[in-house]
């Protein structure tokens, strides 16, 4: 942290997951490590705050792209149902009924590092369209 302490607008952005806040059946190790990242973020913010370093975490939800498409496809094949059925079932657990993009997550990171985010620290911010259940 010596370089960060010498930087006037230092900001650390950790990446966790909405699974760290909600829990995730059959994915205990994943959800546990994401929960730990939330606690790490809050603790580090308290430790580094007096030096002017802000620390926050982003909690992405279901991020569109090849990875989640593969997950949906594998689940569809194992259940013997169409891909669209799996996708729709998952998105029914999201209030906004859509996935987020990597760009959505990046835009929040940029905001947190900007002048507009100068007083935000120790926060875990969901970028998820309000995932209700995983």
Description of each model-found segment:
Residues 38, 60-70, 74, 78:
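Short, flexible catalytic-loop segment of classical short-chain dehydrogenase/reductase
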Residues 17:
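Residue(s) in the substrate-gating loop at a strand-loop-helix junction
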Residues 21-22, 98, 109-110, 121-134:
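Short C-terminal tail/terminal secondary-structure segment
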Residues 49, 54, 120-122:
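Short, small/polar-rich loop/turn modules that mediate ligand/substrate recognition or access, typified
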Residues 33, 41:
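Active-site helix of classical SDR
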Residues 22-28, 50-51, 97, 115:
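Active-site loop immediately N-terminal to the catalytic Tyr-X3-Lys motif
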Residues 79-82, 94-105:
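A conserved structural motif in NAD(P)-dependent oxidoreductases
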Residues 1-11:
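A short helix-coil junction within the Rossmann-fold of NAD(P)-dependent oxidoreductases
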């Amino acid at each position: 942290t010596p370089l960060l302490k010498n930087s006037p607008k230092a900001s650390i952005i950790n990446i966790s997951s909405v699974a760290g806040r909600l829990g995730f059946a059959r994915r205990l190790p994943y959800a546990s490590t994401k929960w730990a990242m939330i606690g790490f973020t809050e603790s580090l913010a308290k430790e580094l705050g007096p030096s002017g370093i802000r620390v926050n975490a982003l909690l992405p939800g279901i991020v569109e792209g090849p990875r989640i498409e593969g997950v949906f496809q594998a689940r569809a094949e194992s259940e013997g149902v169409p891909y669209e059925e799996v996708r729709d079932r998952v998105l029914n657990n999201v209030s906004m009924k859509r996935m987020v993009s990597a760009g959505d997550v990046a835009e929040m990171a940029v905001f947190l590092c900007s002048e507009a985010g100068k007083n935000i620290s120790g926060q875990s911010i969901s970028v998820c369209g309000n995932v209700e259940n995983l």
